[in-house]
Amino acid sequence: MIEIFNPAELERAKVSGRFIATVLQSLQERAKVGTNLLEINQWAGEMITDAGAHSCYVDYAPSFGRGPFGHFICTSVNDAVLHGMPHDYALKNGDLLTLDLAASLHGIVADAAVSFIVGASSNPSDSKMIETTQRALEAGIAAANPGARIGDISHAIGSVLAAAGYPINTEFGGHGVGSTMHQDPHIPNTGRPGRGYRLRTGMLLAIEPWVMADTADLVTDPDGWTLRSATGTRTAHSEHTIAITDDGPVILTI
């Protein structure tokens, strides 16, 4: 399903996007050395509930997961890159933490992710990975103009990731959003320009480049959700929800 939103609905989407951005910023500021991942999940749940929003994750039960996710936010640490299930773990100095949050406010979903170092980092490769995913996200967003194709976004993202020397996994990537969290079209993190679905004004897209330091292969934790790099190396992930408008892409989750 691909939904097309009118101008009034896009204004509601902006409110949803700003909410997600505010929650993620608050959680990033509160995530310190010693903070437990379960505390972060609790804080996210409190902010979602207080705003009258609806979590997209608590009841989320796709075919690739093991039952409902059951938490409000994904917390991926170090070699975990996607769908990190909050658990009893206290953050350590130098941990690379990714927070990925999706919620519906006023009936429209926004989805965003941010990676950052907890405390002080002694590993320049972490900073490079994070910065590379941010640049890839910027490139993908810049390519998301009305009339462009999904392949144009994918190619822009993949060009940045490949130039930095990172292998690219295409199993998981960006996606449409709207009244639900995961909609068509799928947006791989590499692709051929001029291919795929043509972008239309009124579409909402979640664009999310992610990388693992030296592999494109994933392994799944016993929890049935958390995806890690197959080699145990570190990972990074950046994501924004955008609207396609007549004037070009507009980032909603800021």
Segments (PLM) and residue ranges:
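Active-site neighborhoods and metal-handling regions in enzymes and metal-associated proteins
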Residues: 1-254
